[in-house]
């Protein structure tokens, strides 16, 4: 019965977007509206796979025989989950700012050199090189990618983003640490490592996954109604998935 309930909407859609969980489900439609490509308005079905159970859905699209696969495009959004030790207490915000940011540098290197979750290669292999399937993965997690996408070389431009404003409201004490880090840099644009450090510190200011997704979603909807000037950048892999389904 579950399979029938899930499959039925797919059959009447123009395309399908598969995401890991309810947090992404809340956000992707709002993200698509920010770039004027509403998934719902374009009849794209958003499917919450309840974790990372993508394989059963890939099988609906991966046959080399066109008569044995669904005809619409399918995009899959997933995290690469490098360096799972980042969840440990030694990498919380207070620890990251100690000893001249020693743990922050370790966290950055751990993520940059960490092994990509094997799920990504498995999904790529299972897609069977079918042009109707696109696997879109982002380094670490969605929450980190959101922060990274909204940090720029110019410090003032970073502070003017909607994301910076939101996290400032949610966690002012944490964002004081972000401000302090940036104020300690020279009066110049930030390099790549420094931008990533700021993104990591912002990421560590966030509340739990579900709370952040719900709060960000409401905040973006309100901001988009108030202002025509979008001050929020989508993570690249999310935008790639949307653009694939809605060229």
Regions picked out by a protein language model, each given a short descriptive name:
Residues 1-247:
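Acidic, divalent-metal-binding catalytic cores of TOPRIM
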């Amino acid at each position: 019965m579950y399979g029938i309930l899930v499959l039925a909407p797919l059959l009447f859609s123009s395309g399908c977007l598969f995401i890991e969980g309810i947090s992404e489900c809340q956000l992707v439609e709002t993200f698509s509206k920010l770039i004027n490509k509403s998934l719902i308005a374009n009849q794209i079905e958003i499917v919450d796979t309840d974790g990372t159970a993508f394989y059963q859905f890939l099988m609906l699209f991966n046959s080399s025989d066109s008569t044995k696969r669904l005809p619409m495009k399918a995009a899959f959004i997933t995290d690469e989950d490098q360096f799972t030790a980042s969840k440990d207490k030694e990498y919380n915000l207070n620890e990251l700012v100690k000893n001249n940011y020693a743990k922050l540098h370790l966290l950055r290197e751990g993520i940059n050199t960490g092994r990509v979750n094997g799920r990504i290669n498995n999904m790529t292999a299972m897609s069977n090189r079918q042009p109707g399937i696109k696997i879109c993965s982002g380094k670490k997690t969605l929450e980190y990618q959101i922060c990274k996408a909204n940090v720029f070389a110019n410090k003032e431009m970073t502070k003017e983003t909607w994301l910076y404003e939101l996290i400032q409201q949610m966690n002012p004490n944490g964002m004081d640490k972000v401000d302090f880090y940036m104020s300690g840099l020279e009066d110049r644009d930030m390099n790549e490592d420094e931008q990533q450090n700021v993104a990591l510190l912002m990421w560590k200011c966030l509340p739990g996954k579900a709370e952040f997704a719900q709060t960000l979603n409401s905040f973006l909807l309100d901001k988009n109604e108030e202002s025509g000037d979008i001050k929020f950048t989508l993570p690249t892999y999310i935008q790639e998935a949307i653009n694939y389904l809605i060229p």
